[in-house]
Design a protein with these regions (language model features):
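Short sequence/structural segments immediately N-terminal
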Residues: 4-9, 17-145
Protein backbone atom coordinates (compact mmCIF):
# COMPACT_ATOMS: atom_id res chain seq x y z
CA UNK A 1 0.00 0.00 0.00
CA UNK A 2 2.87 2.36 0.77
CA UNK A 3 4.30 1.91 -2.72
CA UNK A 4 0.91 2.62 -4.31
CA UNK A 5 0.57 5.78 -2.21
CA UNK A 6 4.04 6.97 -3.26
CA UNK A 7 3.31 6.32 -6.93
CA UNK A 8 -0.02 8.13 -6.67
CA UNK A 9 1.68 11.05 -4.89
CA UNK A 10 4.31 11.41 -7.64
CA UNK A 11 1.67 11.16 -10.38
CA UNK A 12 -0.37 13.91 -8.70
CA UNK A 13 2.78 16.00 -8.19
CA UNK A 14 3.76 15.61 -11.86
CA UNK A 15 0.22 16.56 -12.88
CA UNK A 16 0.29 19.64 -10.65
CA UNK A 17 3.64 20.74 -12.09
CA UNK A 18 2.36 20.25 -15.66
CA UNK A 19 -0.83 22.20 -14.90
CA UNK A 20 1.14 25.04 -13.29
CA UNK A 21 3.50 25.17 -16.28
CA UNK A 22 0.59 25.35 -18.73
CA UNK A 23 -1.03 28.08 -16.65
CA UNK A 24 2.17 30.15 -16.58
CA UNK A 25 2.73 29.74 -20.33
CA UNK A 26 -0.86 30.80 -21.04
CA UNK A 27 -0.53 33.77 -18.68
CA UNK A 28 2.74 34.75 -20.38
CA UNK A 29 1.12 34.67 -23.84
CA UNK A 30 -1.68 36.97 -22.67
CA UNK A 31 0.52 39.63 -21.12
CA UNK A 32 0.40 43.07 -22.72
CA UNK A 33 3.21 44.16 -25.05
CA UNK A 34 4.98 46.77 -22.93
CA UNK A 35 8.66 47.02 -23.93
CA UNK A 36 10.88 47.49 -20.90
CA UNK A 37 8.05 46.48 -18.54
CA UNK A 38 6.56 43.11 -19.58
CA UNK A 39 8.98 42.24 -22.41
CA UNK A 40 12.61 43.02 -23.21
CA UNK A 41 13.09 46.51 -24.63
CA UNK A 42 14.44 45.88 -28.13
CA UNK A 43 14.63 49.64 -28.84
CA UNK A 44 16.32 51.28 -25.82
CA UNK A 45 17.56 54.21 -27.94
CA UNK A 46 14.16 54.97 -29.46
CA UNK A 47 14.22 56.55 -32.93
CA UNK A 48 17.66 55.35 -34.02
CA UNK A 49 16.91 51.73 -33.13
CA UNK A 50 14.04 51.61 -35.64
CA UNK A 51 15.08 54.24 -38.18
CA UNK A 52 18.09 52.45 -39.66
CA UNK A 53 19.25 50.75 -42.84
CA UNK A 54 17.20 47.58 -43.24
CA UNK A 55 16.69 45.21 -46.14
CA UNK A 56 18.70 47.48 -48.43
CA UNK A 57 16.50 50.50 -47.65
CA UNK A 58 17.67 53.54 -45.68
CA UNK A 59 15.16 54.53 -43.00
CA UNK A 60 17.60 56.68 -41.01
CA UNK A 61 16.08 60.04 -40.11
CA UNK A 62 18.63 62.07 -42.07
CA UNK A 63 17.71 60.10 -45.21
CA UNK A 64 13.95 60.21 -44.61
CA UNK A 65 13.93 63.92 -43.76
CA UNK A 66 15.93 64.70 -46.92
CA UNK A 67 12.70 63.74 -48.75
CA UNK A 68 10.59 66.23 -46.80
CA UNK A 69 10.23 69.42 -48.81
CA UNK A 70 11.69 72.40 -46.97
CA UNK A 71 13.26 70.38 -44.14
CA UNK A 72 16.86 71.48 -43.47
CA UNK A 73 19.71 68.96 -43.64
CA UNK A 74 20.25 67.56 -40.16
CA UNK A 75 23.50 65.66 -40.77
CA UNK A 76 25.79 68.19 -39.09
CA UNK A 77 23.52 69.80 -36.49
CA UNK A 78 21.88 66.76 -34.90
CA UNK A 79 23.99 64.61 -32.58
CA UNK A 80 21.30 62.96 -30.40
CA UNK A 81 17.85 61.90 -31.58
CA UNK A 82 15.23 63.11 -30.79
CA UNK A 83 16.70 65.50 -28.20
CA UNK A 84 18.43 67.70 -30.79
CA UNK A 85 15.26 67.82 -32.92
CA UNK A 86 13.82 70.04 -30.19
CA UNK A 87 16.09 72.85 -31.43
CA UNK A 88 13.46 73.47 -34.10
CA UNK A 89 10.51 71.37 -32.93
CA UNK A 90 9.77 72.90 -29.55
CA UNK A 91 6.29 73.96 -28.43
CA UNK A 92 5.32 77.17 -30.22
CA UNK A 93 7.85 76.74 -33.04
CA UNK A 94 6.82 77.22 -36.67
CA UNK A 95 8.03 73.70 -37.47
CA UNK A 96 5.49 72.30 -35.02
CA UNK A 97 6.20 70.60 -31.72
CA UNK A 98 7.98 67.27 -32.02
CA UNK A 99 5.28 65.54 -29.98
CA UNK A 100 2.63 66.44 -32.57
CA UNK A 101 4.85 65.70 -35.59
CA UNK A 102 6.06 62.32 -34.27
CA UNK A 103 2.66 61.10 -33.09
CA UNK A 104 0.97 62.20 -36.32
CA UNK A 105 3.55 60.43 -38.48
CA UNK A 106 3.59 57.26 -36.39
CA UNK A 107 -0.17 56.82 -36.08
CA UNK A 108 -1.81 58.19 -39.24
CA UNK A 109 -3.17 55.61 -41.69
CA UNK A 110 -2.94 52.76 -39.15
CA UNK A 111 -3.94 50.11 -41.72
CA UNK A 112 -0.98 51.10 -43.91
CA UNK A 113 1.50 52.21 -41.26
CA UNK A 114 4.80 50.39 -40.66
CA UNK A 115 5.04 51.55 -37.02
CA UNK A 116 1.60 50.15 -36.24
CA UNK A 117 1.97 46.91 -38.24
CA UNK A 118 5.58 46.04 -37.34
CA UNK A 119 6.01 47.56 -33.89
CA UNK A 120 2.43 47.14 -32.59
CA UNK A 121 2.22 50.95 -32.38
CA UNK A 122 3.52 50.57 -28.84
CA UNK A 123 4.19 53.84 -27.02
CA UNK A 124 7.08 52.21 -25.17
CA UNK A 125 9.09 51.81 -28.37
CA UNK A 126 9.70 55.58 -28.23
CA UNK A 127 8.97 56.31 -24.58
CA UNK A 128 10.15 54.65 -21.39
CA UNK A 129 8.29 54.47 -18.11
CA UNK A 130 9.48 53.92 -14.58
CA UNK A 131 6.86 51.48 -13.24
CA UNK A 132 7.56 52.54 -9.66
CA UNK A 133 7.10 56.27 -10.10
CA UNK A 134 5.01 56.27 -13.28
CA UNK A 135 7.37 58.86 -14.79
CA UNK A 136 7.40 58.74 -18.59
CA UNK A 137 10.36 59.93 -20.66
CA UNK A 138 11.26 60.02 -24.34
CA UNK A 139 14.07 57.64 -25.30
CA UNK A 140 17.14 59.29 -26.78
CA UNK A 141 20.15 57.95 -28.66
CA UNK A 142 23.17 59.07 -30.65
CA UNK A 143 22.58 59.67 -34.36
CA UNK A 144 23.24 56.66 -36.59
CA UNK A 145 24.55 58.39 -39.71
Amino acid sequence: MKTTTKILFFILLAGAVAAATLFLVAADNNKPFLPGVTVTDEHPNGCVDCHKVSGGDDYRLNAELANVEGHPKIDAIVKNVPQDCLMCHKVGANAGPLSVVAHRDHYRNPNDNHFVSSYQGACLNCHSVNPGSGKMTVKNGPKNW
